[in-house]
Amino acid sequence: MPTLREQIATTALTVTKFRELVRKMHSNRPNDDLEIVKKAYEFSLKHHTGQTRASGEPYLVHPLQVAQVLADMMMDPVAIAAGLLHDSVEDTSVTIVDIRKEFGEQVAHIVEGVTKISKIDFATREEAQAENLRKMMLAMIDDIRVVLIKLADRLHNMRTLEHLPPDRQQKIAKETLEIYGPIAHRLGMGKIRGELEDLGFRYLDPIGYQQLHDVVEARRKQGEQFLQRMESTVNEKLKEAGITASVTSRIKRLFSIHKKLQRQRITVDQVYDLFAMRVITRSLQDCYAVLGIVHNVWRPVPGRIKDFIAMPRPNLYQSLHTSVITEDGTPFEIQIRTEEMHKMAEEGIAAHWKYKDGAVSAQDEQRLAWLRQVVEWQRDVSDPSEFLSTLKIDLYPEEVYTFTPKGKVVVLPREATPIDFAYSVHTEVGHTCVGAKVNGRMVPLRHRLHSGDIVEILTQAGHKPSRDWLSVVKSSRARNKIKHWLNIHQRERAIEIGKKLIEKEARKYRIFLKDMKDEDLRRVASDYGLGAPDDLMAGIG
């Protein structure tokens, strides 16, 4: 039972933060009824009083900060109430039944989705991590607010990671970079993704982080006048053309630089988009007009013009990217997008969140399509290690953009093959594929696809997948579908062989399998610790 002094200290600190939260919510969504939020605050205050975090702060500060992040996303009162309650089941005596009774089914469903399964239920930490992620992703499908709370929770935990011992910092940072940063990326939430990744990099590789930070900071100071000059030139040209736009400059985030240096084996001086300018226009037409203007001023780098407006990324990110070479030979990236596109790039699925009767917008459904696919692909993966490794591939693939003959875009992992393409179209197309044409030319099934390839799959009825395909495919969908098919057909073959062996042995004792009742066969299987006669036959076969 907390002392009176502890209760007073907790109340004094948290009341101020709660008032800030309410002000933010009133500002963002003035017509919302905040009664459920106030009730959730009082409930959390009651049950978390006396608890402290590793920083020494009252524990309730954490749910309040999570709620503040959600308020910054302009989330609804139900989401923010769930944010205030998100640790109550995990860290207090409160149960989901209590939450449901006090706050209703919606809040209870969300809180249950973000609550970790007890560690007691698992043999290893890896198994616990895999099952908790699987649970969260299944809950996300029903209510995206589950993952938005989880991201807000992880963001505040990363912001306060300094208070934990180094070994825990490393584990949490690694999981953040492998799972939560990529999830934010997949949902188009660039702002949160960037902060999560930089914080993860800082704690996972503190020496590498500091070295890169010092190099980039030196470049930033050297480049301040250069950036001002570039902005001034663009503003002047836009004014001459009668285009109203916002022009700002930025330096690429540290983790993004780090990944590029690793992937391309280059130095910081060779990073084309270390410095970048962002031009935010009022209309789509102005985006393309601005692109023409900057190409008239500076020479574009061949192969560095990317039109993500005409062909959005899978997370629906839209922008024009171009790299140019300035008069003094400095490479420089310019991103051009509308205000609406910029909001979507920064906030992603949270940008237009309008929750109504449990439904999301068509655009948000498109964003969540990848999640539904991932859950489907992982359904048959029981091994925790395999689940985690394939999930990481699915969350953060290096993507290539290919096309069907009818022009439909098919996004695949880098170095994907026609087999991957076939399985992405349909499972049966994958199972029966015998060949492929890429850009009108016959290619082997091991052929590596590239962005822009037009792929036609050739199929043959009755054809079956080959085990050799597992060493060729790159997508987890293809790998899991092939494994699933092989497992089913291997089992069928094993049952057939086992049945023949049992019949042969039984005949020695003048016993005929066809005369045995199902209960007799089940009893024999049970004696060997097996659930069904087919399990017995498969084991023998």
What do the PLM-derived regions correspond to, one by one?
Residues 8-18, 92, 96, 104-107, ...:
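Internal insertion modules embedded within essential enzymes
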Residues 1-142:
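Metal-dependent phosphohydrolase cores
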Residues 280-282:
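Short hydrophobic/aromatic beta-strand micro-patches
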Residues 295:
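Solvent-exposed beta-hairpin/edge-strand motifs
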